[in-house]
Amino acid sequence: MTRRVNVGGVLIGGGAPVSVQSMTNTDSRDFEATITQIRALAENGCDIVRLAVHDEACVRTLRRLADESPVPLVADIHFNHKLAIGALENGVAKVRINPGNIGGEKNVRELADCLKTHHAPVRIGVNSGSLEKDVLNKYGGVTAEGMVESALTHARMLERCGFEDIVLSLKATDVRKTVEAYRLASRVCDYPLHVGVTEAGTPGMGNTKSAIGIGALLLDGIGDTVRVSLTGSPLPEPEAAIEILRALGLRAGVDVISCPTCSRTCIDVAGIAKRVQEATRQVKTPLRVAVMGCVVNGPGEAREADLGLAGSKTGGALFVKGGRAREVKGDLYEALMDEIRKRI
């Protein structure tokens, strides 16, 4: 089991539920735009939000952002450890750094002392595109072994400073390399792991890459917090991550299953299923709901769900806990939602 760290009240590692993260893409100096996006991400299910802190103007905005944010904030820092210290002094709950780009051991010690003072963890975020030159030369390019070595080298530097609240991430653009790196890290250390595929791309292919990479790791029991990285607005990211967790049984909620439809389909399966998903997006009650188009597979699939709707030429049939409950000839969606509302 991994170690446990506390990010502003959200626990990561040590058997805690897998949390969902995302990152703002607003100008962090613009309070109104940034807090609006943070709130929207939280509304979409995000547990922790990261934002880029690239100058002193960003730091000055952090106190108000941290005070008004509904979720803990993480400062993403590059090159200047003083910005990390300023961010911690202004209320962020965690800092993310890249290995090797905040200076030598003196700077690392100053950061470690500040992290201890504020009881905040740090993430050492290794990306395949920014590995140190000596690591690239040693391994002949980007490899899982090199990514893990980079992360552990800098984790040990922090531990020599007496600081151990460390999270690692080992993200590559290549799904196989990402999975290989996390599997290797899980064998050689007990740091909590933030998992994801970096620069996965636009929605669609990006979701697919993330689902394969994150899903493969979570099935292995690897991963304590996740981010689905998508090009464009970050608002779809939390939902995509939550869908992965729900598919693996790691997050409770309404699981809507529906048939792919064929010429036997008697009802608007896609329309009903989509409306049910939208209506139950925020529901935490574990419930499996089946929307099936006809009487061939419909009754059988519906019997495996808590609630099911199977279409027929005259309307549809509702199933509850595997048993045929009643025939429906009116609004099929509302009939199904009435049953759902009784159980949530």
Name each region found by the language model.
Residues 18-24, 47-51, 73-77, 95-97, ...:
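Hydrophobic faces of well-ordered beta-strands that scaffold small-molecule active sites
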Residues 56-77, 110-122, 182-193, 276-280:
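Alpha-helix-loop-beta-strand connector modules within alpha/beta enzyme cores
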Residues 68-71, 88-95, 116-119, 186-192, ...:
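Glycine-enriched alpha-helix->loop->beta-strand junction motifs that scaffold or abut catalytic
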Residues 82-123:
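Hydrophobic or amphipathic alpha-helical targeting/insertion segments
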Residues 1-23, 116, 278:
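N-terminal amphipathic alpha-helix/helix-capping segment at the start of soluble metabolic enzymes
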Residues 126-127, 135-284:
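Catalytic alpha/beta core domains of metabolic enzymes, predominantly
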Residues 15-33, 52-54, 71-79, 135-148, ...:
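Active-site mouth loops of central-metabolism enzymes
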Residues 25, 30-31, 42-66, 96-104, ...:
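Glycine-rich, proline-tolerant flexible connector loops at the mouths of alpha/beta enzymes
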